[in-house]
Amino acid sequence: MNRQAWTVYGRFQLDRGFRIPDPAQIHWGAPGDAGPGTSVLGAIGGKRLLDLGSGGGHYAAHLARERHAVVDAIDVAPTQHQRALLQYADVPGVRFLLGDAIDHLNRCEPYDLVYSVHGLGYLHPHRSLPALYRGLRPGGRLIFSVLHTDLHRRPPSSSLEPRQLKVQLKGLEPQDVHLWVLAPQLWEDVLTDHDFTVEAIDLLHRHEDDPVIDQLIQARRA
C-alpha cells in the first residue's frame, strides 16, 4: 500500500517534469517550515550516511555536495528512485539505491548515521529498529521525523498499532497508506527496547494554517 502510493506520486511528478529545488537545509516537518535544519546531524564530513526513504534524493545530494558526507539514499518506489537519478545521478558522494530499506540494513556495511524525513513512520518499528541496530556502527546515530498528530488532527497513539490514512499528495487523489503515529513516550520505549538511547524528542509545529505537528527524534545505538 505505501509503496504503491509513492510510486503513483513519483509517476505524477515525472510526467509533469517537476524538478525539486535544491534545498539549503533539511526540513524535518513540512517543506519550507522553520526548524533545526541540517545542524542536528552534527559534523558529517567524510561520514557514511543512509537516507531512508529518500524520495527525489534532494537531501542526500545536498549533504554530499554541501556537507561532504558519503550518502547512500534508498527508496522502495521505483518512480521516486528514477526522479532522484534524473536530477542527481552526477553528484559525487551519493549513491541512489532502489529497494527495501530493511533488507539493505541487514546486509550493508554499518553506517555512521541514518536519517529519515518521514520515512520511518511507514515501517513497523519491530521490523525497522532491529535492522537499524544492525546497520549502524556502535555509537552510530539515528535521526528521524514522524507525525505527532495525523492529517485529521488526531493525537498520537499510545499503542503500537498503525493507522490507515488517506494522504493528500499534491495534484493527486488521496492515497491510502499505513502509518505509525506514536506518542513520544512510546517511541522512546520502543527505541530503548531495541538498544537505542533516546537523546532528544522535539515537537515541530508547522505554519499557522497547517494543524499537523511533527516529532524529531534523535537516538544513538548502543
Region annotations inferred by a language model:
Residues 127-138:
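A short glycine-rich, Lys/Arg-flanked "PGG" loop and its adjoining helix->strand segment in the class I
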Residues 113-126:
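A short SAM/SAH-binding and catalytic strip from SAM-dependent methyltransferases
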Residues 106-114:
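A short acidic, Gly/Pro-enriched loop at the edge of an enzyme's catalytic core
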Residues 196, 209-222:
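Core SAM-dependent methyltransferase catalytic element
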Residues 178-195:
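Short alpha-helix
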Residues 48-103:
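Class I SAM-dependent methyltransferase SAM/SAH-binding core
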Residues 1-45, 58, 141-170:
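Conserved class I S-adenosyl-L-methionine
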